[in-house]
Amino acid sequence: NTLLVCAAVIRFRHLRSKVTNFFVISLAVSDLLVAVLVMPWKAVAEIAGFWPFGSFCNIWVAFDIMCSTASILNLCVISVDRYWAISSPFRYERKMTPKAAFILIGVAWTLSVLISFIPVQLSWHKAKPTSPPDGNATSLDETVDNCDSSLSRTYSISSSLVNFYNPVAIMXVTYTRIHR
């Protein structure tokens, strides 16, 4: 379905001329990236019973967070776009230019990359390893065949606020105002 959405917008000129469809394409791309960069790797690991991709784990975790964040932020941008289009249609036509749309899309994707890759590459996202009962300091998290994506409490809370709760609150407000 995602590919069909992209193909339709690319194929039909009247769909390309609507700024709103830029946001739809951005959402479709984020969903497509989940299907390409996240799901296959996890499926192979689940089938194999271990993580066969070694140090690719951190990059995979960053892609997972990035794609999920991009999807949510794109949904948020779409809700704001629809609110502006409905609440101020004449101003919307003047202000929501392709340039403005690309800026909003760029902000959503930039935030997604920053929120995912920086914390993951700096290991801010990881829960502190716990020592096993035998007192050995190594953790399962450190083994090559385990891609443990357990999150630290601080990262989990801050990431949830920025990546999920704030965008959902914005969407709830915009759609509530639209339906009034």
Curated annotation (Swiss-Prot):
The answer to whether the entry has keyword Transmembrane helix is yes
Q: Which UniProt keywords apply?
A: Cell membrane, Cell projection, Disulfide bond, Endoplasmic reticulum, G-protein coupled receptor, Glycoprotein, Lipoprotein, Membrane, Palmitate, Receptor, Transducer, Transmembrane, Transmembrane helix
Per the record, ranges on the Cytoplasmic side are: 11-21, 81-99, 180
Q: Which GO annotations describe the biological process of this protein?
A: adenylate cyclase-activating adrenergic receptor signaling pathway; positive regulation of MAPK cascade
Glycosylation-annotated residues: 136
Name where it's found: Cell membrane; Endoplasmic reticulum membrane; Cell projection, Cilium membrane
Q: Which GO terms describe its molecular function?
A: dopamine neurotransmitter receptor activity, coupled via Gs; G protein-coupled receptor activity
Query: Any transmembrane segments, and where?
Result: 1-10, 22-48, 58-80, 100-124, 154-179
| Principal location class | membrane
Which parts of the chain does the record assign to the membrane side Extracellular?
49-57, 125-153
Q: How does it sit in the membrane?
A: Multi-pass membrane protein
Q: Name one GO cellular component term.
A: endoplasmic reticulum membrane
Is Glycoprotein given among the entry's keywords? yes
Superkingdom classification of source: Eukaryota
Name which cysteines form disulfide bonds: 57-147
- Assembly mode: Interacts with DNAJC14 via its C-terminus. Interacts with DRD2. Interacts with DORIP1.
PANTHER family, alphabetized: ADRENERGIC RECEPTOR-RELATED G-PROTEIN COUPLED RECEPTOR, D(1A) DOPAMINE RECEPTOR
Q: Which family does it belong to?
A: Belongs to the G-protein coupled receptor 1 family.
Protein's job: Dopamine receptor whose activity is mediated by G proteins which activate adenylyl cyclase.
Question: In its UniProt entry, what is this protein called?
Answer: D(1A) dopamine receptor
